[in-house]
């Protein structure tokens, strides 16, 4: 039982550190984008070592290819597309990598809320 609690505690600490590193990257980005990139890389190392998932709010804020911290309008272009399946297109302006995130769940949720009224 002690090993289970110890493992759980390590994962909690890792998630906390990931959150701290990403919030530091967000705060320091306007002054030093390279330092923000380093914070993202450190957060990814912590995540890999502890085998935990990065929270969704941070997962979409860095480039999967060059690990740059993405800020829409500065080093990332964000577009909404409806073709085939509704999705968000995020293009990293540092390396040119394109990431697509579907948002069907959000649309279904909105429809459901509309039907309830």
From Swiss-Prot:
Q: Give the subcellular location.
A: Cytoplasm
Q: According to its UniProt record, which reaction does this protein catalyse?
A: Endonucleolytic cleavage of RNA, removing 5'-extranucleotides from tRNA precursor
Ubl conjugation as a keyword? no
Co-factor note (free text): Binds 1 zinc ion per subunit.
Q: What class of enzyme is it?
A: hydrolase
Source taxon at top rank: Archaea
Q: Which cofactor does it need?
A: Zn(2+)
Q: Disulfide connectivity?
A: none
Presence of keyword ATP-binding: no
What EC number is given for this enzyme? Answer: 3.1.26.5
Q: Any idea which GO molecular function terms this record carries? A: ribonuclease P activity; zinc ion binding
What does the entry give for GO biological process? tRNA 5'-leader removal
The positions annotated for binding Zn(2+) are 63, 66, 92, 95
Give the keywords, sorted.
Answer: Cytoplasm, Endonuclease, Hydrolase, Metal-binding, Nuclease, tRNA processing, Zinc
Report the GO terms under cellular component: cytoplasm; ribonuclease P complex
**PANTHER family membership:** RIBONUCLEASE P PROTEIN SUBUNIT P21, RIBONUCLEASE P SUBUNIT P21
The function of this protein is:
Part of ribonuclease P, a protein complex that generates mature tRNA molecules by cleaving their 5'-ends. The RNA is catalytic, but its KM for pre-tRNA is 170-fold decreased in the presence of the 4 known protein subunits (Rnp1-4). The protein subunits also decrease the amount of Mg(2+) needed for activity.
Which family, according to the similarity comment? Belongs to the eukaryotic/archaeal RNase P protein component 4 family.
- UniProt cross-references to HAMAP family, sorted A to Z: RNase_P_4 (MF_00757)
Q: How does it assemble?
A: Consists of a catalytic RNA component and at least 4 protein subunits. Forms a subcomplex with Rnp1 which stimulates the catalytic RNA.
The molecule here is called: Ribonuclease P protein component 4
Its gene? rnp4
């Amino acid at each position: 039982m002690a090993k289970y609690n110890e493992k759980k505690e390590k994962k909690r600490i890792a998630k906390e550190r990931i959150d701290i590193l990403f919030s530091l990257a967000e705060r320091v980005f306007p002054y030093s984008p390279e330092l923000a990139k380093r914070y993202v890389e450190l957060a990814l190392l912590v995540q890999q070592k502890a085998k935990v998932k990065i929270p969704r709010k941070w997962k979409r804020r860095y480039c999967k290819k060059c690990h740059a911290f993405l800020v829409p309008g500065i080093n990332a272009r964000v577009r909404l597309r409806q073709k085939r399946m509704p999705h968000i297109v995020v293009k990293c302006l540092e390396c040119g990598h394109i990431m697509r995130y579907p948002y069907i769940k959000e649309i279904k949720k909105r429809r459901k809320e509309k039907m309830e009224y």
